[in-house]
């Protein structure tokens, strides 16, 4: 089975696909009852299993269930989890929710919200030969025609992710004398990188990774907490869909850390890749260029919905550039007008330095693609990593080249990427500190920038995945 996931998680060409119901090495814990003795297993005609005790009493046995979370927390394979994700998070699932809304009784409908990433918007703009602003408005028009209630831009959520990353770096820099694991701080927005770190390097690498949530998951907090309150709804009454450049975002949305136990709902219910949205357009017989534009929705009255916005610093969110500028000013009182990148081994590994009187004060880097990530990890393990901060992304060339982006039917890949980069950069940029509505939400929704509530809703944690050495994992 060919996997549609990005190359970030496919470290070899080996296809380890197993159907979730066929074989699995996940051990199941069974509580042993004292003095239970020997029992027999009886199989009924319908395939159900009964335990027959020595005293003649029988008890139906529960089937062992392997959930998506079990798959994600297991180092046995990757593709089983991918298979489940493809069925649980697809444009067909969105269709089901929209169709259910059409026949639901008043008050039983779910509010459907779609949050679109700037990278996906740029990819669609290149395909339909539109600019990014027109694409955003026409995409809003399309979603609302098929039954979606609100369409937002995830760039607004990225303001919070960038601001939290900035603050966290400054705090770590000031604490580096007391902690060997404070620096380098590694960016946390890429789920392919996070999955690799948790499963391959575990407790060694995780302390270095920023705890700031990615824009997708900040958007999840905004929609299922702030926006739900504004709409006088509980989180489970909202169906939240994100449109992302990468299949690995489906893995991120499925993490238990982003699941609301009280209301039994995820912060992001469904992740669609750019390609899946294009497929949805095709199935509906709609060309984006022919639709009438409709303004995006704003999360608050102070947030303008007239046009989409973005940030400086490249197509992966600009984490290095924003953290670098903030740290230079906050730690050394130096205003940085332009950030100059110095290519190192290749175009996907570049350095940025802050110097004063010949002394290097800050040394940052971008590391895109697993070859560069592996080199970075090896430097860390040898204690020879010279960097204070690294913007890490699993995909070569970063998020604009994500595995879920549209491929060119008649254009060379590099040429298409350049076109997508150009369209992405044409959108008006703003500093996260100055973005309308951000400080308002920090005060009224999060109860302050350094509050426990802000920490809970804007940060996350990571979990080392213990490798299971089991004979059951050997395929003879």
Swiss-Prot record:
Binding site for [4Fe-4S] cluster 1: 24, 71, 74, 77
GO molecular function: 4 iron, 4 sulfur cluster binding; metal ion binding
UniProt xrefs under SUPFAM superfamilies: Fe-only hydrogenase
Record protein name field: Cytosolic iron-sulfur assembly component 3
Keywords recorded for this protein, A-Z: 4Fe-4S, Acetylation, Iron, Iron-sulfur, Metal-binding
This protein's record includes keyword 4Fe-4S: yes
InterPro entries: Cytosolic_Fe-S_CAF (IPR050340), Fe_hydrogenase (IPR009016), Fe_hydrogenase_lsu_C (IPR004108), Fe_hydrogenase_ssu (IPR003149)
Family affiliation: Belongs to the NARF family.
N-acetylalanine sites (modified residues): 2
Pfam families: Fe_hyd_lg_C (PF02906), Fe_hyd_SSU (PF02256)
PANTHER family for the chain: NITRATE, FORMATE, IRON DEHYDROGENASE (PTHR11615)
Function: Component of the cytosolic iron-sulfur protein assembly (CIA) complex, a multiprotein complex that mediates the incorporation of iron-sulfur cluster into extramitochondrial Fe/S proteins. Seems to negatively regulate the level of HIF1A expression, although this effect could be indirect.
Keyword Oxidoreductase carried by entry: no
SMART domains on file: Fe_hyd_SSU
One GO process term, biological-process aspect: intracellular oxygen homeostasis
Binding site for [4Fe-4S] cluster 2: 190, 246, 395, 399
GO cellular component: cytosolic [4Fe-4S] assembly targeting complex
Subunit structure: External component of the CIA complex. In the CIA complex, interacts directly with CIAO1 and MMS19.
